[in-house]
Structure formats: C-alpha cells, structure tokens
Amino acid sequence: MPVSTLCWHLARRPEGIPGPSDFVLREMPLPPLPRGQVELEVHGLSVDPYMRTRMQPQGYGYLAKWGPGTPLSAWGLARIRRSRGRWREGDWVVGHLPVANRVHVRVPEPDALLPLCLPAATPLPGRWLHEHGMTGFTAWLGMRHYGRPQPGETVLVSAAAGAVGSLAVQLAHRAGARVIASAGSAAKRTWLRERLGVVATLDDRDPEGFAEALAEAAPEGIDLDFESLGGAVFEAAIERLRPCGRVVLCGLISQYHDPEPRRAPPNLARLQAIGGRLVPFVVPGHEPEHWARFQAEMAGLDPVAPLDVLHGLEAWPRAFCGLFTGKGIGKRVVRLGCQSALSAAW
C-alpha cells in the first residue's frame, strides 16, 4: 500500500496578521526511501515568529521563501524510523523538518540534523524545542557570543517575555548584568519582574511613552540592546546607548507583517557618533562551530522556560497565528501524537 504523509503548505501569502485560511493541509505520497536518506517520525515542532518573514515576497533573504503551494518547515524533534544511511534506526534527532505528521517524513541526511543528546538533568523532549533547541541557540548566540554582557552593565531586552527574549534575559542575568525588559502586556511585565527578576519593565506597545520610560529606568544609559522588536523601541534604545555601546540585532518583529523590506531607525547614524557597534546576526551556519558549547552552557543555566504546548498537527495554523496576538509567555510548540518513551511528559 502506498505510504503518504500530511504536510502543511502555504495556501496564499498573508496580508497583515496571518489567519488559518492562509494555510492548507495536504496529503503527500512518500517515494521509496533512497540510499543515503532517513525516514523520520516527527514528534514535535517549534512555532516561531521568523516564519512570517518567509511568507513575504521580498527581503529576508537568508532563508528560502514560501510561495503559495510551498510546504512549510520548522525546527523539529523526530525519531529515525528507517535509515539507509549512517544513522541508526530509533535514534532521536533535531533539525529543520517539514511541518508534517508523525507517520513518515523523509528528509536527506544533512549536517543540519543533530543527534539528540540532552544532558541527564534535562530529560524532557520539549526542551529540545526551547532552551536546548534553536530558540535557546538564538538567545545564546545573540547574548553570550555576540553581546557579551559584563558584570554591572545595563542591558535592554525587547520582546522579553517571548521564547528568545526570556532566555536572553536570563543569560544576561547570569553574566551579572542589570536587565531592563520590555513587553506588551501588564501580565507579561509582572511575570518578568516576579519570575525573572528584571530591575524594570517597559510597555513596548506605548511608542509615545517608551523613550521617557527607558530614560527613567536607565538614567545613565544602556550598554547593550538585545533587539527583537524594532520600530520606536529600537529608536529609543539607540538614543539611550552609552558611548561604545552595542546593539545585537536579533529580529524586527514589528515589521514582519509588512511586505516591504525592513527599515532602519532614523537615528541609526548615532551609533557612529558614539562609537557604538551594531551586530546583526542570523542563526543558520553557526551550528557546527558553536552547538556543543551552547549545549554545555545551557545545561548549567537551568532557566525558567515555560512551554505553551498545542496538540496535533491540525493545531499548527492556530499555534502560529496565535503568536501575533501578544498574549503568550515563553515558547509555543506543537506536539504530535506519537507514542514513544519520550511521550509521557514534556
């Protein structure tokens, strides 16, 4: 009997905030497994804001575009069901996988697939989709590798209650920095103060008052801006940057729904005047060099890392579209209904 899988595709390019009708679930046949490839059973998928940029017609060129009819992909956790390559059946892997169901997903055996080797103190599989996965790697790469906060420095983290931002806050804390965080709701700001211990929280949905609030929270300026939001928040951060300060540019979420290419803040030239440094970065390509060090450091962090788990492949559009409502805290993932030793707890 022919083998098939279910896979989410882009039905049309979203206009503004995506809705469920922008995606379509299709059954796809799977050909016989070629030599050198593995057949994967997907157990969990990461849901991330950057995916919105892949649906835009231009800009954001570091990842392939998704046009109408294109199958979607995400960072995922999977088990090797069959192998005609160097990896063993039954092994667990993480990597960029099709947004497809748990039955049979065939992918090549590239270096982008990483073996599952969670530290013994962190045995839960959902952790590979959050702090031990691409989300944690993004926060670690931006904050620890590029930002390098020092004891006593003042660090601003925007979108700080999200998956990447909340981990970036904790990495800055671990380095001994004084952390100011922005978030878009009172509940998020309370969580950041009470659970993550930031010294001040700012409302990033109040562009008129943000600059004044930041000046009150950091009267002597900030040394490092971990920027994920853009817009008025980014502009205000540049204005408060101290001489020789740094900006680590992780993302510009406020512009992700805009079909036009991303725009720089009007005061970007101030960086030159103060001897500041702007470090934009993307994750692809960093894994081979830094993955092992990242895993070792994250194992010792034991972060506060809430998971928002939705169940079933059918929930993927709802999970993705819900990212942009501004209500979630922590990391959103989709767990597929595979039965295994890793299924009991997440």
Locate each region found by the language model.
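NAD(P)H dinucleotide-binding glycine-rich loop of Rossmann-like/cofactor-binding domains
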Residues: 72-79, 86, 91-159
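Generic hydrophobic/aromatic pocket-lining and core-packing "Φ" positions
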Residues: 143, 168-169, 189, 234, ...
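Short amphipathic alpha-helix with an adjacent loop that forms part of the alpha/beta core around
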Residues: 208-219
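Glycine-rich phosphate-binding loop and adjacent beta-alpha segment
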Residues: 232-302, 337-346
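Mid-domain Rossmann-like dinucleotide-binding core that forms the NAD(H)/NADP(H) cofactor-binding site
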Residues: 129-207
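C-terminal hydrophobic helical "lid"/dimerization subdomain
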Residues: 3, 287-346
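Glycine-rich beta-strand-centered segment in the early N-terminal region that forms part
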Residues: 30-47, 55-99
